[in-house]
Regions:
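Active-site beta->alpha loop and helix N-cap motifs at the rims of alpha/beta catalytic domains
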Residues: 61-139
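Glycine-rich, proline-tolerant flexible connector loops at the mouths of alpha/beta enzymes
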Residues: 18, 43-67, 133, 190-191
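Alpha-helix-loop-beta-strand connector modules within alpha/beta enzyme cores
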Residues: 8, 55-84, 147-154, 206-214
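Catalytic alpha/beta core domains of metabolic enzymes, predominantly
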Residues: 123-214
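Hydrophobic faces of well-ordered beta-strands that scaffold small-molecule active sites
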Residues: 6-10, 45-47, 78-84, 122-126, ...
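N-terminal small/glycine-rich loop or linker at the start of catalytic domains
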Residues: 1-22, 86-94, 125-132
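Active-site beta-loop-alpha junctions enriched in small/polar residues
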Residues: 9-13, 50-52, 83-89, 129-131, ...
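Conserved, mostly hydrophobic/aromatic
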Residues: 30, 37, 48, 124, ...
Length: 214
């Protein structure tokens, strides 16, 4: 029987303690959740960090550093996966659609991979996706993705290529062909997310058929 890889996202990008009080917030809580997951059998722990004031997703380097150090210092054999997703939330201003509203969180591609270059996790997420969400656009332009992928490759960190729909696989294949993502690629299907591909067997078979050969 083939081995099964269990990956545990201990917070995700959206849930907050308002929705579920069990969602970890502090670096110690996040690290302890990751360590518990590893001891329960997870091979990969996927980590976001949270602002200690707002409890919402944060990009603060020192929060990532504390989480990474706590996990690395623990007696667990687990692959550390840090997100690069934050910094791509765009919602147009109602007064001027060409500008971002207060609900947006946009930043440079360099900022989005700052913690990856500094901390060098085993792997990191790379969302090759632009798509509508409930209240905003998840905006990852080809230019920004190329810059991020190049930094990640030069840091010798393996990107976990997150695809939410079929076209995202084509985008990733172009980046592989251009030498921005090293082979063999590591893909992750993100299915059932508003408004991406549905979580069905048919979807998985179609997306699997589109993978690069080998």
């Amino acid at each position: 029987m083939p081995s099964t890889i269990i990956s545990c996202a201990v917070t995700g990008s959206a849930p907050t303690p308002d929705k579920n009080p069990a969602v970890p917030v502090t670096p110690l809580e996040i690290a302890n959740s990751a360590i518990d997951a590893a001891r329960a059998g997870a091979a990969i722990v996927h980590c976001h960090v949270r602002s200690l004031e707002t409890k919402k997703p944060s990009m603060e380097l020192e929060l990532y550093r504390e989480v990474a150090n706590l996990i690395r210092d623990a007696d667990v054999d687990v692959i550390l996966n840090l997100t690069t997703g934050p910094g791509a939330r765009f919602s147009p201003s109602s007064a001027d659609p060409g500008k971002a509203s207060a609900n947006s969180q946009m930043c440079s591609p360099e900022k989005r991979v700052e913690h990856i270059l500094e901390l060098k996790p085993d792997i990191c997420s790379l969302d090759v996706a632009t798509m509508n969400r409930k209240s905003h656009v998840f905006l990852n332009s080809p230019e920004h993705l190329n810059v991020m992928a190049d930094y990640i490759r030069k840091a010798n960190v393996k990107p976990e290529i997150e695809v939410f729909d079929t076209g995202h696989i084509l985008n990733a294949k172009k980046m592989i062909d251009d030498g921005l993502i090293a082979e063999p690629p590591f893909f992750l299907f993100c299915l059932g997310v508003d408004y991406g591909a549905p979580a069905t067997l048919e979807t998985m078979l179609l997306m699997r058929s589109m993978f690069p050969k080998g």
